[in-house]
Amino acid sequence: MNCLQLLLVLLLISTIAALHGDGRVPQRRGRNIRTMSNLLNFQTRDCPSSCPAVCPNQNECCDGDVCNYSNTLNKYFCIGCGSGGGE
């Protein structure tokens, strides 16, 4: 989760907490609580299991994925479908 996503989650949580404190949150009537990804409207797509998780040559990632360098781990990783994919 990147910093922007974390800030959005914290903002959402603080807004919900503030509304609960004021008693302004409407009661749910038979609806399930939506997942955080639905609340943040993340796009999902079908990802093949053959997508690599790492990209040492910076060109191994599946279409639509981004090869990103981690300073902490000194490695290139595929971000997107390949994250944790079929390495």
UniProtKB/Swiss-Prot annotation:
Tell me what PTMs the record reports for this protein.
Contains 4 disulfide bonds.
Assigned GO CC terms: extracellular region
Give the intrachain disulfide bonds. none
Tissue expression summary: Expressed by the venom duct.
Which residues, in ranges, are excised as the propeptide?
A: 19-34
Its annotated compartments are:
Secreted
Question: Looking at the keywords, is Zinc present?
Answer: no
Which residue positions does the secretion signal occupy? Answer: 1-18
Q: What does this protein do?
A: May interact and inhibit Cav3.1/CACNA1G calcium channels. In a ex vivo model, shows ability to block nerve signal transduction.
Kindly provide the name given to this protein in its UniProt entry. Conotoxin QcMNCL-XIII0.1
Q: What is the lineage of its organism?
A: Eukaryota, Metazoa, Spiralia, Lophotrochozoa, Mollusca
